[in-house]
Amino acid sequence: CSSDLLYAKKNHNNPLATSFLPTTRAEMDKLGWDQCDVILVSGDAYIDSPFIGVAVVGRMLEKLGYKVGIIGQPDYESDKDIKRLGEPRLYWGVSGGSIDSMVANYTATKKFRNSDDYTPGGKNNKRPDRAVLVYTNLIRRYFKDTVPIVLGGIEASLRRVTHYDYWQNKLKKPILFDSKADILIYGMGEIALMQLTTAINNKTDYKDIR
């Protein structure tokens, strides 16, 4: 990861060491940013904690010198949230959140859950079913011909290959086909994401990563 560290040494100025990663245009302006390098979209509210995958990934990329913004639980019926940080320079990162959205929204008997520990107030009214698909489609709808969309997190990881869908009682294709995203990183993907970010930043073909 020497190129990552070199990028960090050249570009890293850490005004965020004791604050949150930006979630609004006003917060970006306060940091003097015209554009984020990476925007992470999550089915959870943004909690700056080592227990939250998106926060960990965001802080890791920040330490390497990249400008990272986070959109937590965007409104999926309008453009007001997904467009508030603009378009990233390198890629979008999309996660359904810390819990698979279908598990977060329904019990094993398919009854809707009224509570969500990762939503402000604890009320389950912010996370859509199949959040990864919804957020990816939201980006595609409002940003035509955008930079790559990278999927990660438990929801995408569990659906990375052909799989049985309990909710629809049928086999489903890998989520990359249904979502029309570009890349999927599964499991503990910090190293892979570092390599991917370096490749995209250096304008090299990420398909050659091994």
Task: Name each model-derived stretch.
Residues 31-38, 88:
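A short, charged/proline- and glycine-enriched loop
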Residues 6-32:
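Short N-terminal or domain-adjacent regulatory/targeting segments
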Residues 56-68:
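Short helix-loop-beta junction
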Residues 6-15, 64-65, 116-128:
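Acidic/glycine-enriched edge-of-secondary-structure segments
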Residues 26-29, 40-44:
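Long, low-complexity, serine/threonine- and charged-residue-rich intrinsically disordered N-terminal tails
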Residues 9-12, 41, 79:
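Catalytic cores of nucleic-acid editing and processing enzymes
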Residues 1-2:
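Short, small-residue-biased leader/transition segments that mark boundaries at the very start
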